[in-house]
A protein has these predicted regions:
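Acidic, surface-exposed loops and disordered segments
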Residues: 1-217
Length: 217
């Protein structure tokens, strides 16, 4: 499976089988996180065999069951933190999909995580991780015209990027992002209000860049 296939096949999964993640897959995820943290300055952490965080009333209310592994998206407080966590967190989530694992972005439906949060840092959200009991289902998406703008005929690479962005997971499926092509540059912004819209924007930007081969401002 390549990363484009992973974007198409990754769906949110909330219920997990009682199956341990193999050591080689753990190592691959840890190696990727090390690269990401060096590149981004974030402090993303992965917690294996830690069931307490999702053994809570909030987690069960959110219909999470069997979650024993998760990724904690942590970084220094700042205006760009949420977007960076979305961008780099999805990079890990897609690697997990390539490795045959399942994931789900989790905002509030969990208990206290075991991540180590240093002074001046903040935990933005978590990503549940493991072998899902199902592969999840596709979410409904907005029309391409609702999340993109161009002042010229839409290039094929831009179309591919927007299509991939529409496959990005967003909080309560809100998809409050906009991609605009101006000249040869792409700008992505949040429009409207909502929970975790900046995190959603980061996820969508990563999808766009992977599928289009172009950077987004």
């Amino acid at each position: 499976m390549d990363i484009l296939q992973a974007i198409e096949e990754r769906h949110s999964v909330r219920q997990y089988a009682d199956k341990a993640i193999e050591q080689e897959k753990r190592q691959a995820l840890c190696d990727e996180l090390k690269k990401i943290n060096t590149e981004s300055g974030l402090n993303i952490q992965i917690l294996f065999d830690e069931p307490q965080c999702f053994d809570s009333m909030m987690a069960h209310y959110g219909k999470f069951f069997g979650v024993k592994n998760y990724i904690a998206l942590v970084g220094k407080k700042g205006k760009s933190l949420e977007e960076k966590c979305g961008y780099y967190g999805e990079r890990v989530a897609l690697l997990a999909q390539i490795l045959g694992l399942n994931t789900c972005w989790v905002a509030m439906s969990h208990g206290k995580s075991a991540a180590k949060i240093e002074r001046g840092e903040k935990q933005v959200c978590l990503i549940a991780l493991g072998y899902g009991k199902t592969q999840g289902v596709a979410h409904k998406s907005k029309a391409m015209s609702e999340v993109s703008k161009t002042d010229v005929a839409m290039p094929d690479w831009f179309k591919k990027g927007v299509e991939a962005a529409l496959l990005a997971p967003t909080a309560i499926n809100q998809q409050k992002f906009m991609f605009e092509l101006s000249g040869d540059e792409v700008f992505a912004t949040v429009y409207g209000f909502g929970f975790y819209v900046k995190t959603d924007l980061g996820i969508a930007k990563y999808h766009f860049e992977v599928a289009s081969g172009r950077s987004v401002k």
